[in-house]
């Protein structure tokens, strides 16, 4: 089984890891609701599930009088 011949120093290890950075998620604004949401994700707004400006699920309850 392969194993390292020498110990890699903390400095050398950390230099290698400088390129691994956290990036901020891409945020879109829905044209219909004006709600900010992640790209390619459906989002809830006032009891309705929206995706690309269309209502997918309508969970608003109508009160019968």
From Swiss-Prot:
PANTHER family according to UniProt: 50S RIBOSOMAL PROTEIN L32 (PTHR35534), LARGE RIBOSOMAL SUBUNIT PROTEIN BL32 (PTHR35534:SF1)
GO MF, any single term: structural constituent of ribosome
Domain of life: Bacteria
Membrane-spanning intervals of the chain: none
Keyword GTP-binding: no
Protein name: Large ribosomal subunit protein bL32
Organism, as annotated: Christiangramia forsetii (strain DSM 17595 / CGMCC 1.15422 / KT0803)
Keywords, sorted A to Z: Ribonucleoprotein, Ribosomal protein
């Amino acid at each position: 089984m392969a194993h390292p011949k020498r110990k890699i120093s903390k400095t050398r290890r950390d230099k290698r890891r400088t390129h691994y950075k956290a990036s901020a998620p891409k945020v879109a604004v829905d044209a219909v609701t004006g709600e900010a949401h992640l790209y390619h994700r459906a989002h809830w707004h006032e009891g309705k599930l929206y995706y690309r400006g269309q209502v997918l699920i309508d969970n608003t309850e109508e009160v019968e009088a």
